């Protein structure tokens, strides 16, 4: 990291990564945090408020800004998707000093957070009963309930297969259509479990509904499209020597990141790949944080 530089945490979440970046960044640095989830931004705000700085977390394209102090960077929190970095310039309207080629580093920790998984009312998990929602941004229109109850059988099977890599997608989709209407996570998990007998190659610890819930979440939130947009934006907004770091948690995400970095280094020649193989969590880290077992970190530098 370059002390006093400008960095983006594209998935600020609960503020853990942002806090560590801010500690190392210092003044007169600038940290911009983006997240779709306003509830997560409120938690991050509390974590990042130091030296009596104050925040007003921004809605839409407006910002919550903490001024820099002698040893703490300016911090701007935006309720925006990181896909907007490619789609338009709205995230930067609150940061007029920023523009193309001005960012020293960009971090994205892709996927659902522990906070979202543990809140039954958000509908991300089959571990507790809740409404079929699955929206990271509660202001977005499409919910998992709408997908489950309104897509036709073929479309639903395609979603489950493409985004969940679920080989039993057609059987599961057929069972879902026959069981409509489905309003809760528990009901959906029950339908999937009855339709999807475990395959011989699957570890017994994987619940039959795991891949289908993943597929619905990715589809509802357009996660892969957003990731592609972020990777397209990175070479435009980074300075020469600026770095993009992406942490992913399943093969679909990792494949997109790997391909984007490889294409950017070979075909377009605007990236230098820093991680020939993804970095994985140590055994110690996995013991502290079991979710880290599936995490893969890749990094590239703009040339």
Regions from the language model: what does each represent?
Residues 1-51, 70-95, 99-303:
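S-adenosyl-L-methionine-dependent methyltransferase catalytic core, i.e., the SAM/SAH-binding region
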Residues 53-55, 61-62, 67-72:
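Short polybasic linear motifs
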Residues 58-59, 96:
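Prokaryotic Sec-type signal peptides and long signal-anchor helices
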